[in-house]
Amino acid sequence: MWEVLVIKTLTKENIMDLPIALKTASEKLVVGYKQAQLKKIAQDLSDRYRNESGAGKVLLSKDIEAAVYALVRMPATYGAVSDALSYSLEYFNGEIKTLLDVGAGSGAATWAAQAQLPLERITCIEREGAMRRVGEALMKEGEPVLSSARWISSDLTSSKITTSADIVISSYVMNEMAKKDRQFVLDNLWAATNEMLLIVEPGTPAGF
């Protein structure tokens, strides 16, 4: 199907295989759009994130933008979180049953964590409505713990986190916010953590 070709084109540099349920759900998000349209949206998003990240701006607002973002970024994000979590768990002797995915986006970190941990409860915090809708739609296609995940609309830079979890994951979040807001957010992440705080950021000169 052409949707699969689009995914391969948009994610050609990201070789991490996604779970079948997630990959299938991702394909459904772009049904009805032509490959040229998706490539244009992907390029616009890439330019926007490259040039405007780090100021706390809203970088996408449409559901199709969030869907394309998921297609482009989820394989790499899923892979990065999977590797970081796997490595961290080698040095961890506690028990993890609850997850808080902060700045969850389309939920890649949650899917990666669920693949390695016996999670019983998942909470996702995401500011952007389009991202929340896409993330929820994707998780509805997953296992019960994913489909029953609780999604919270909140701006991390201005609101305290009012829930806690055994593991708190923040992936590709800190670098997108203004520097002045990072300490406040970090303090809140740590306060919400019962056992492990995992922060994943891009390994670039401009990264956090």
Show which residues each predicted segment covers.
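N-terminal auxiliary segments of SAM/dcSAM-dependent transferases
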Residues: L10-G56
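Class I SAM-dependent methyltransferase Rossmann-like catalytic core
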Residues: K57, S61-D83
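Conserved class I S-adenosyl-L-methionine
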Residues: E95-G105
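Conserved SAM-binding loop of SAM-dependent methyltransferases across substrates and taxa
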Residues: S106-L119
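Conserved SAM/SAH-binding beta-strand->alpha-helix loop
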Residues: E128
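S-adenosyl-L-methionine
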Residues: E136-I161
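A short SAM/SAH-binding and catalytic strip from SAM-dependent methyltransferases
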Residues: D166-K180
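Conserved beta-strand signature within the Rossmann-like core of class I S-adenosyl-L-methionine
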Residues: N194-G203
